[in-house]
């Protein structure tokens, strides 16, 4: 005699998933990839994450110290991009106040705390200037602006880019043959963090923790 009740009709929707034999992958995931490409990738990843020698650790520690970042930040960027950090981009508005003097000349006044940090920086430094924050620069003044800035920062600034978005930042780095993977941003606030992230920079360092 057949069953008078349709047990299949009253089954919970998740019963089939619960009864299904689990896969052999981690956490009931897909099966382990045994392909040649996967093996090569796992081997390369294992070598990249291998514990470095004491000499390498010291070299990386000194580099991080020169750049004003932590050892962890340096190595994280290295593992994510395969490149060593060596350059920094800072918004001009964060580094200095720009105004016109009584005779119309451009005056750059470094912010005291930033000037001291720039003096300690041991990498390549670039500034990104928002055209709207600089008082109506002419083309001639813009061409001479780097020299004016470097008089205020003791020649530490390598180049200045103009704009306020990721395209302007990447364009400045490309014009100076600097890979963006080797560059981090020193900024303050969410706006600078979003700018660095959208430009693909591996690290955005808050100025409050720079060299601290």
Task: Name the predicted role of every residue range.
Residues 148-156, 185, 204:
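Preference for solvent-exposed, low-hydrophobicity sequence contexts
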Residues 34-91:
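Amphipathic alpha-helical packing elements
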Residues 117-122, 149-154, 172-181:
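Flexible, charged surface loops at secondary-structure boundaries
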Residues 89-126:
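Long, compositionally biased
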Residues 1-37, 41:
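Eukaryotic charged/polar low-complexity linker/IDR segments
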Residues 128-134, 160-164, 186-190:
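Structural motif
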Residues 169-212:
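Extended, charged low-complexity segments
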Residues 139-143, 209:
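Extended low-complexity, polyampholyte segments enriched in Ser/Thr/Pro and acidic residues
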């Amino acid at each position: 005699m057949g069953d008078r009740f349709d047990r299949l009709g009253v089954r919970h929707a998740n019963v089939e998933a619960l009864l299904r034999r689990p896969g052999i992958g981690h956490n009931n995931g897909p099966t382990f990839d045994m392909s040649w490409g996967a093996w090569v990738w796992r081997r390369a990843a294992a070598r990249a994450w291998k514990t470095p020698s004491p000499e390498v650790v010291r070299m990386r520690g000194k580099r991080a110290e020169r750049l004003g970042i932590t050892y962890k930040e340096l190595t994280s960027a290295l593992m994510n991009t395969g490149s060593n950090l060596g350059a920094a981009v800072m918004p001009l508005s964060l580094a200095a106040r720009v105004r016109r003097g009584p005779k119309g000349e451009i005056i750059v006044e470094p912010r005291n705390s930033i000037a001291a940090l720039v003096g300690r920086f041991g990498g390549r430094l670039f500034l990104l200037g928002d055209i709207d924050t600089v008082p109506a620069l002419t083309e001639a003044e813009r061409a001479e602006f780097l020299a004016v800035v470097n008089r205020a920062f003791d020649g530490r600034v390598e180049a200045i880019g103009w704009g306020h978005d990721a395209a302007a930042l990447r364009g400045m780095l490309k014009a100076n043959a600097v890979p963006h993977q080797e560059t981090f941003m020193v900024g303050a606030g969410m706006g600078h963090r979003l700018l660095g992230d959208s430009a693909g920079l591996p690290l955005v360092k808050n100025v409050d923790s720079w060299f601290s």
